[in-house]
A protein has these predicted regions:
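Bacterial N-terminal signal peptides that target proteins for export
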Residues: 2-12
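C-terminal motif of bacterial Sec signal peptides marking the signal peptidase cleavage site
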Residues: 19-22
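Bacterial signal peptide processing site
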Residues: 24-26
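Extracellular beta-rich ligand/substrate-recognition surface
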Residues: 28-30
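N-terminal helix-cap/turn-to-beta initiation motif at the start of protein domains
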Residues: 32-47
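A short, Trp-centered hydrophobic/proline-enriched beta-strand micro-motif
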Residues: 44-52, 155
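Central antiparallel beta-sheet cores of small beta-barrel/beta-sandwich binding domains
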Residues: 51-134, 138-142, 176
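Edge beta-strand at a domain terminus
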Residues: 142-154, 158-179
Protein backbone atom coordinates (compact mmCIF):
# COMPACT_ATOMS: atom_id res chain seq x y z
CA UNK A 1 0.00 0.00 0.00
CA UNK A 2 1.43 3.34 -0.97
CA UNK A 3 0.75 6.59 0.76
CA UNK A 4 1.12 9.94 -0.88
CA UNK A 5 2.44 12.93 0.93
CA UNK A 6 0.13 15.92 0.63
CA UNK A 7 1.77 19.02 -0.83
CA UNK A 8 3.06 21.53 1.67
CA UNK A 9 0.67 24.50 2.07
CA UNK A 10 3.45 27.02 1.32
CA UNK A 11 4.21 25.21 -1.94
CA UNK A 12 0.55 25.43 -2.95
CA UNK A 13 0.42 29.10 -2.01
CA UNK A 14 3.54 29.81 -4.09
CA UNK A 15 2.15 27.87 -7.04
CA UNK A 16 -1.13 29.80 -6.89
CA UNK A 17 0.70 33.13 -6.66
CA UNK A 18 2.83 32.33 -9.71
CA UNK A 19 -0.22 31.23 -11.72
CA UNK A 20 -2.17 34.35 -10.79
CA UNK A 21 0.71 36.68 -11.62
CA UNK A 22 1.24 34.94 -14.95
CA UNK A 23 -2.43 35.34 -15.82
CA UNK A 24 -2.60 38.97 -14.80
CA UNK A 25 0.52 40.18 -16.59
CA UNK A 26 0.03 42.61 -19.49
CA UNK A 27 0.42 41.32 -23.04
CA UNK A 28 3.65 41.75 -24.93
CA UNK A 29 3.79 43.39 -28.34
CA UNK A 30 6.83 42.83 -30.51
CA UNK A 31 8.20 46.16 -31.73
CA UNK A 32 10.83 46.29 -34.47
CA UNK A 33 13.65 48.81 -34.37
CA UNK A 34 12.27 50.40 -37.56
CA UNK A 35 8.85 51.03 -36.00
CA UNK A 36 8.37 54.62 -34.84
CA UNK A 37 7.46 55.39 -31.22
CA UNK A 38 3.75 55.89 -30.56
CA UNK A 39 2.56 59.37 -29.60
CA UNK A 40 -1.18 59.27 -28.93
CA UNK A 41 -1.89 62.89 -29.86
CA UNK A 42 -0.10 62.43 -33.19
CA UNK A 43 -1.70 59.12 -34.22
CA UNK A 44 -5.36 59.58 -33.28
CA UNK A 45 -6.60 62.98 -34.56
CA UNK A 46 -8.90 62.36 -37.53
CA UNK A 47 -10.58 59.07 -38.37
CA UNK A 48 -9.15 55.66 -37.52
CA UNK A 49 -10.73 52.32 -38.44
CA UNK A 50 -10.03 48.85 -37.13
CA UNK A 51 -10.97 45.24 -36.66
CA UNK A 52 -10.63 43.33 -33.44
CA UNK A 53 -11.53 40.23 -31.49
CA UNK A 54 -12.20 39.46 -27.83
CA UNK A 55 -11.21 35.90 -26.87
CA UNK A 56 -12.61 34.29 -23.72
CA UNK A 57 -9.68 32.66 -21.90
CA UNK A 58 -11.81 29.88 -20.41
CA UNK A 59 -13.99 28.80 -23.34
CA UNK A 60 -11.94 30.02 -26.29
CA UNK A 61 -15.06 31.64 -27.73
CA UNK A 62 -14.51 34.81 -29.72
CA UNK A 63 -16.47 38.00 -30.36
CA UNK A 64 -15.36 39.97 -33.41
CA UNK A 65 -15.93 43.67 -33.93
CA UNK A 66 -15.19 46.63 -36.19
CA UNK A 67 -14.53 50.08 -34.79
CA UNK A 68 -14.46 53.61 -36.21
CA UNK A 69 -12.70 56.17 -34.02
CA UNK A 70 -13.01 59.91 -34.53
CA UNK A 71 -10.23 61.68 -32.66
CA UNK A 72 -9.45 65.29 -31.83
CA UNK A 73 -6.58 66.96 -29.96
CA UNK A 74 -6.94 70.49 -28.54
CA UNK A 75 -3.40 70.82 -27.21
CA UNK A 76 -4.22 69.30 -23.84
CA UNK A 77 -7.05 66.76 -24.23
CA UNK A 78 -7.29 63.89 -26.70
CA UNK A 79 -10.94 62.94 -27.33
CA UNK A 80 -11.68 59.59 -28.99
CA UNK A 81 -15.27 58.79 -30.00
CA UNK A 82 -15.36 55.02 -30.61
CA UNK A 83 -18.24 53.46 -32.59
CA UNK A 84 -18.24 49.67 -32.28
CA UNK A 85 -20.15 47.25 -34.54
CA UNK A 86 -20.04 43.66 -33.28
CA UNK A 87 -20.44 40.62 -35.54
CA UNK A 88 -23.64 39.67 -33.65
CA UNK A 89 -25.26 42.98 -34.66
CA UNK A 90 -24.79 44.91 -31.40
CA UNK A 91 -23.60 48.50 -31.73
CA UNK A 92 -21.99 50.59 -29.00
CA UNK A 93 -20.41 54.03 -28.60
CA UNK A 94 -17.75 54.96 -26.04
CA UNK A 95 -15.92 58.27 -25.64
CA UNK A 96 -12.42 58.51 -24.17
CA UNK A 97 -11.00 61.80 -22.91
CA UNK A 98 -7.27 61.67 -22.22
CA UNK A 99 -5.50 64.58 -20.60
CA UNK A 100 -1.74 64.79 -20.95
CA UNK A 101 -0.33 65.18 -17.44
CA UNK A 102 3.35 65.25 -18.40
CA UNK A 103 5.44 64.27 -21.38
CA UNK A 104 4.41 60.71 -22.22
CA UNK A 105 1.84 60.33 -19.41
CA UNK A 106 -1.93 60.70 -19.49
CA UNK A 107 -5.01 60.22 -17.38
CA UNK A 108 -8.25 59.26 -19.03
CA UNK A 109 -11.96 58.86 -18.43
CA UNK A 110 -14.71 57.03 -20.28
CA UNK A 111 -18.36 56.51 -19.36
CA UNK A 112 -17.84 52.87 -18.28
CA UNK A 113 -14.39 53.27 -16.69
CA UNK A 114 -14.27 53.10 -12.91
CA UNK A 115 -12.10 55.97 -11.68
CA UNK A 116 -9.38 57.12 -14.06
CA UNK A 117 -7.38 55.27 -16.66
CA UNK A 118 -3.62 55.67 -16.55
CA UNK A 119 -1.52 55.72 -19.73
CA UNK A 120 2.22 56.10 -20.14
CA UNK A 121 4.91 55.76 -22.76
CA UNK A 122 7.27 52.83 -22.31
CA UNK A 123 9.93 52.69 -25.00
CA UNK A 124 8.12 52.75 -28.34
CA UNK A 125 4.82 51.56 -26.84
CA UNK A 126 2.02 53.10 -24.81
CA UNK A 127 0.63 51.14 -21.86
CA UNK A 128 -2.87 51.74 -20.58
CA UNK A 129 -4.41 50.41 -17.33
CA UNK A 130 -8.06 50.86 -16.40
CA UNK A 131 -11.07 49.16 -14.80
CA UNK A 132 -14.41 48.81 -16.60
CA UNK A 133 -17.88 48.23 -15.17
CA UNK A 134 -19.52 45.42 -17.17
CA UNK A 135 -22.98 44.31 -16.11
CA UNK A 136 -22.37 44.71 -12.39
CA UNK A 137 -18.81 43.36 -12.52
CA UNK A 138 -15.63 45.41 -12.59
CA UNK A 139 -12.88 43.97 -14.79
CA UNK A 140 -9.34 45.22 -15.28
CA UNK A 141 -7.76 45.96 -18.65
CA UNK A 142 -4.02 46.16 -19.31
CA UNK A 143 -3.41 47.40 -22.87
CA UNK A 144 -0.21 47.69 -24.85
CA UNK A 145 -0.33 49.81 -28.02
CA UNK A 146 2.45 49.89 -30.60
CA UNK A 147 2.90 51.35 -34.07
CA UNK A 148 4.05 48.99 -36.80
CA UNK A 149 6.40 49.82 -39.64
CA UNK A 150 3.44 49.99 -42.07
CA UNK A 151 1.78 52.73 -39.98
CA UNK A 152 -0.90 50.51 -38.44
CA UNK A 153 -1.36 50.36 -34.69
CA UNK A 154 -1.61 47.08 -32.79
CA UNK A 155 -3.48 47.12 -29.47
CA UNK A 156 -3.30 43.99 -27.32
CA UNK A 157 -5.10 43.86 -23.99
CA UNK A 158 -5.40 41.43 -21.13
CA UNK A 159 -8.75 41.41 -19.33
CA UNK A 160 -8.76 40.17 -15.74
CA UNK A 161 -10.72 39.84 -12.54
CA UNK A 162 -9.05 39.38 -9.14
CA UNK A 163 -5.70 39.04 -10.93
CA UNK A 164 -6.88 36.12 -13.07
CA UNK A 165 -6.97 36.53 -16.85
CA UNK A 166 -10.49 36.05 -18.19
CA UNK A 167 -9.91 37.23 -21.74
CA UNK A 168 -7.79 39.07 -24.21
CA UNK A 169 -8.41 41.62 -26.93
CA UNK A 170 -6.44 42.13 -30.11
CA UNK A 171 -7.23 45.15 -32.25
CA UNK A 172 -5.52 46.45 -35.38
CA UNK A 173 -6.13 50.10 -36.28
CA UNK A 174 -5.35 52.10 -39.43
CA UNK A 175 -5.89 55.72 -40.26
CA UNK A 176 -8.86 56.07 -42.58
CA UNK A 177 -8.08 57.45 -46.03
CA UNK A 178 -8.88 61.16 -46.34
CA UNK A 179 -11.96 61.87 -48.41
Amino acid sequence: MSTSIPPHPLFLLGLMASLVSACASPPEVAVTTAAPPLVLESFFPGRTVGQGVFTNSWTGSQRRFDVVIDGSWDGRTLTLVEDFAYADGEKDRKTWRFERTASGTYKGVREDVVGEARAWTEGKTVRLDYAVSLGGWTVDFADVLALREDGSLLNKATVGKWGIRIGRVELELRRAPSS
